[in-house]
Amino acid sequence: MTQRRQFLINAPLGLLAVAGAARGEPVPQVADTPGAPPTFGATPPVGPDVTPATFAEAEKLMQVRLTPAERQMAAASWRVSLASTMERRTGPRKLAIEDSVAPATVWHPAAAVGAQIGPTAGPAHERFVRSRNDAGPLPKNDADIAYAPVAKLSRWIETRVLTSERLTRIYLERIQRFDGKLRSVITLTEDHALARARLADKEIAAGKYRGPLHGIPYGVKDLLDTKDIRTTWGAEFYRDRVPARDAAVVAKLDAAGAVLIAKLSLGALALNDVWFGGQTMNPWLPEEGASGSSAGPGAATAAGLVAFSIGSETGGSIVSPAMRCGVTGLRPTYGRVPRTGAMTLCWSLDKLGPMTRGVEDAMLVLKAISGVDAGDVASVPARLDFDATAKVAGLKVGYFAGWMKEAPATDVDRAALESLKKLGLTPVPVTLPDWPYQSLNTVLFAEAAAAFEEITLDGRVDQLKAQVPDAWPNLFREARFLSAVDFVQGDRMRRKVALEMARIFREVDLLLVPSLRDEMLTISNFTGHPSLTVRTGSVMVEQARSDWAPNPAQPLPTFKPARRVPHGVTLIGRLFDEGTIARVGLALEKAAGVAGERPPGF
């Protein structure tokens, strides 16, 4: 993503990390591990001498100016001023802060705009109405069964024309046959899956049907803990990490009777699509990556290796692979789905959501994984109002006129807006202030660097496969130079942006935006609004696409003639109103008529 690549190149750098570990007076310089913090109370102190000249150089980064006397005072006193910070990291009373410990300040999207938080958030009513479509007869071809949406698979399993064990074996065979091309699976849970499938069949035969996910095989992004099954976060130094308990979402899916079949790939520590096993590829265009960081969920779902998957998003990690791989990606409202037992990248931004082959499937999964959990202080009880049979005519859909005229918008995006108009929605042009939205990423990078402070300072981050300017190792290191003042100002700006989005949603019921529009990826993730990415057509590409910054030494493949790949639009809804964007997405999906298309060769 452009915002990930560019932000720290242009971000202001803080004064805290320019300091080594010396007092104002001259001291001997000693060797130290790169990236290691100053040793509290050490003699001689670690690192180079900090002098008034150090602060003079730092002023260039911070765009501030001190007088000579102020520089002298800062150089003489900085160690005393920051002693408590250093002691927390390296002193005799140093304190380890577990990944599960969230900051004391908790982001609540509704509260940020002045809304009252009651016992339950969201719509006035709890409702879930499935479509009335008949699943039809069970196909004779295994591939046709594998690609069927959960909405159909669940009907076949409920009526016992299809067993969970047979369906599980179909997906296991497809993984064995196709995943060598995709590298979407980190850990195959074959024995676990077959045992769960047999249990599901036994329960259903006994009349103990748990609901539409009962017996349905799925995969989860490998940042969700699974009891006694390794959870690697896509990183080499975590490849043998085996949790003692399931993540809350995995436990909820287990309670729904779903069958965990695979732990799916993610870009290492949730960035892009390269993990310790290689790059996850796009089944529609195997010469390019699947995008990330929910690369495995996107690729495996698109290739019919699982019935559905669970991805995560911090700044585009559901939207982007859903677009690239041509699947449906639902990013829930921040706080709707508990993240207990999930890898933390950014406490105030991380979200978990379904990636499926259809809109109704996404809502079936969302219903199962929603809810509050004591382990996630940001999770809230929220009603879900979805009626697949309800009309969409009369709704107001906002759009940004300028964005629809320029890249990354395409004719497919513009046609989708016209389709909504034909379906009876009223298009309403909306605007946002011309603000530097990417500066919000101060919060993201500071939180991410805090989450991974230990591996940054002990050097393990250097073992990650991707060591380029826009990968986490460099970003974590650079984030040590961010200003605490800029972090607070970014957080305050976040509230202003949330108020602007609240203003827009007083005028419209939902937004339609080009999926990869950087400004809206940033804005909607920081404000916590839900999004639904729906495939509505195809585009032709002459070159493979990549999440990474261009590298002249490794040019991307080009194609003549151009290749046809999926393309979709993204709908953004009011806070906790996933039901409205799903209703509209379902109508748009039917109008487009491309959701059932499959990648050639899979």
Model segments located where?
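N-terminal, positively charged, Ser/Thr/Ala/Gly-biased leader segments
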Residues: 182-233
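Short helix-loop capping/hinge segments that flank enzyme active sites or metal/cofactor-binding pockets
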Residues: 128-143, 214-233, 391-400, 442-498, ...
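Short glycine/serine-rich loop/turn segments
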Residues: 212-352, 400, 438, 446, ...
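Acyltransferase
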Residues: 161, 166-172, 198, 408-431, ...
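Conserved hydrophobic/aromatic pocket- or pore-lining residues that grip, position, or stack substrates
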Residues: 171, 193, 215, 221, ...
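Glycine-rich, small-residue loops and helix-cap segments
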Residues: 160, 215, 255, 259-262, ...
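A short helix-breaking turn/cap at a secondary-structure junction
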Residues: 124, 131-136, 331-414, 458, ...
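An N-terminal boundary/leader segment
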Residues: 2-20, 24-195, 422-424, 480-481, ...
